[in-house]
Each structure stands twice: as C-alpha cells, then as structure tokens.
Amino acid sequence: MSTTTAILCAFGVYLLLMIGIGVWCMKKTTGADDYFLGGRGLSGPVAALSAQASDMSGWLLMGLPGSVYALGTGQAWIAVGLGLGTIANWLIIAKPLRAYTIVANNSMTLPEFFGNRYHDKKKILLGISSVIIVVFFLVYTASALASGGKLFNTVFGIDYHVALFIGAAVILIYTFMGGFLAVCTTDFVQGTLMLIALLVVPIVAWGFVSGDFSALLTQSGVNSEHYMSLMYNGDHPITPIEIISNLAWGLGYCGMPHILIRFMAIKNEKELRKSSVIAIVWVIISLTLAVAIGVIGRAYLLPAILGETAGAPSAESVFIQMIQETFTNKINLPFIGGIFICGILAAIMSTADSQLLVCSSAVSADIYQDIFKPEATDKEVLNVGRITTIVVAALAFIIAWNPNSSVMALVSDAWAGLGSAFGPLVVMSLFWKRTNLPGAIAGLLSGALTVIIWDYIPLIGGQTPYVATGLYSLVVGFIISLLFIIVVSLITKAPEESIVEEFETYKAYKEQ
C-alpha cells in the first residue's frame, strides 16, 4: 500500500465515523430542544472535550505551532491568555449560566437567555444578539471550511475547491442529521484525537533530535536566546501592549456562544464539576504541547529548513510536516501518520460544526420562532433549523471559495466582536442584579461597534486605532461595553420587581 493510499484510508475511516455518529444521533433527536441543546443531557467528559475542541479549531495545531516555529516562544503569551480564560470560564461562568438559563424559562440559546433574563417583551435584545451571532459566525465557519480545504490540498494535492466541498459536505451531513448531540459527540471524539496527536507526535519526534538543541536552533537561522525567551517576538523585544493584547484573548471566552452553550447543556452539577476538571487539564496540556511542537519543529526539520531535503516547511504546516517526516520517512507507519493528520482535520471540523449549529439556532429558534412565529410547533422549528444549517453552510462555502481570501484575517476580529458584545453582558447578567434592559442593549451595541471602529475606521492620522496603537480591539471593546452596561443601568429605571425576584430565585437554585 502506498503512503498516499494509507493516509487516504485513515481519512476515509475518520470521515465515515463522523457520518456514522450523525446517523446514530439523528435517532435520538426528536425535537428542537434535542437539536439545539441535546435535551440538557451532556455528560461531563463530552461537555468538556466538545467545548474545548470547538474552541481551539485548526489554530491549535496549525496557527499556534506555526507562529512559535517562526518567531519563538514569545508567541506563547496568547496561549497563556487562552488558558487563563478557559479556567475562569469553567470555574466562574459555567455553573451560574447553567442555573440561570434553567430558571429563565429554560432558555435554549444565549440570545433567548438575554431576552428572558431582562423580560424583553419587544425582543430587541434577542434580535440584536442573533444578528451579531449570524454575521460573525458566518465568517468563522467560512474560515474553518477554508482551513479544511487547504489541509486536503496540502496533504493530498487535491484541488482546493474539491477539498472544500468534501469537508463542507461531511460537516453538513452529521450536523444536519444529529444536531447538537451529534456535534458534541463528534467533538468529543475529535478532542480526544487532537490530544493524542499532541501527546504522541512531539514526543516521538523529539527522540530523533540529536545534537545540542541551542546549536540546532542557531543553525536554523534564529538567535537561540531570543527564540526561547518569552520577552522577545522574533529578534524584537516584546512590548507591554503586545503582552496585554495577547493575554486579552482570554477575555473573549465568556462571550463565545458555541462554548457557553455547552455549559447550558450539561446534565447536572456533578457532571459540571467533572467536566471542569477535564476541560482545564485538556487545555493546559494541549496549549503547552502545541507550543512545544513549534519549538521542536525548528530543530527537527532542520535539514528541510537548510534545503538539504525537499519541502522546506511553511510555518503553519510544521505539524503536518513533522507527522509526515516521523511516520512516513522515519518509522514507516503512514496509516498512523494519517490518523494524526486527521487530528488537524478534527480541530477544524469541531469548530465549524459548532459555529454552524449556533448560526442555525440563532435563525430558527431566536429569529423565526421567538420574533416572527411564536406559535411555531417544535417540529417546525426543528425543520427550519435543519434548513438553516444547509443555507448557512452554503453561504460559508461561497465565502471560503477563494483560497487566497482574507477571511482568515477576520477571525481575530470576530473573536473580539463576540467577546466584547456578549462577554461583559454575560458577566453582569449573572452577577449584578441592578443590570437592566437599557444597560444590556447599550453594552451589546457598544461592544460590537467599538471593535468595528477600532479595527476598520481610520481615525488616527489616517490609520485605524489598532494599527496606530497595536492594542487588540477586544481590550477596548470589553472595557467600553462593561462601562456602558454599568452607567446606563444606573441612570435608567431599576429592573422590575419580577426580574429581581427571578434573580434571587436563580441565586438560590445555583447554591443547591
């Protein structure tokens, strides 16, 4: 069996497994609550790994190792920020959010929770938050599909557009059939595969590295002291603003609907405690090993870097090249190498399917049912959700059609937009009973608009504020949104007594 055939077989087994899970979960999905929230029946391990797998995307196995490979360990600050954000999200947000969404009329989605939390009879919060989700997640889904297309193209030489279609079709099939349960179950498998790949590949590759490591780094064309220092970005000292901006990525977690929905869907408090431990351990190990892959790759792939062998690695393909070099050239186990490359595909798919489902729920449950047709039956909402899944996937496919499109550059803006719009509002909704509807609307709009202005409007000497200052828009957007929520809530009418009573009920329920 040729190397390419062996890797193709590994991909085929993996993709068929994902579709099989979708078929199995379809039999368990009977209504909208099952399709969008899994009937609030997620176990701890499934909730933990599905949340983390859907969060990290291909960035964990391509973007982070690639940036460390190119510029050194100073790129690890973003991993530190994401690790701290994950820990805070599970320990501070998860339990209260699950409790409040149950008390607030068993809310199935984040926009629905906001509407129920503030008794928004005019559906203003619901409409604004749903539109924000659809816009940002459409771009997110497109970027994930594009990553999958590029992966197939890199590994097999398949035409990008054919590869894009294959990846999109598989994700659409199991998401369409099984909904949230299929997404979480496949994400559990994918999260496990990602962790195994991260554990095995760098350890095996390290066994083939010989010689003084610092000398190998120097031969590869970098200053070894700068490369291994957290205080350098390449050969340039890292600035405080760069550190703050990278750490600030962690702020986004409390505003990510595709992660927060896992908290809402966990079966009970016991499973929540279990999932918190699993998720935190997973993210610490995974981020650490992803950084290690970039560093080890610099020495391990030295012959290719120096041109002594064919195929000098590009930054983002360092993990792929490490797998191929180890399991094809060194120990001749191409099928196993193919399974580990599937770990990269798993990272991409686990994010795309979650984003697809969040868009679907925003349109069918939050916009169609809650705003336009409150009398819609459960079956009707389920059918609209499935149709929306197809439409959103098709739109994302169109956006991702150009392999050289700038959609990937928009991912950080989407993270900032969602984190700034939803993050402060989630926190204040859970922990400050004085927050009212005007404050919530002000926070939602100010957070999203600040990110757009900061990243796209040339206000400072013909430059955008981001270009002029280098400060990540999430930092500014989060702070401004938080201030708007507090100030507007204090200068407008206090929440109705029924809202305050519901808040007290939630507090009591949370402590049970």
Which residue ranges define each predicted feature?
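Membrane-embedded helix-loop-helix hairpins and adjacent transmembrane boundary segments
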Residues: 1-512
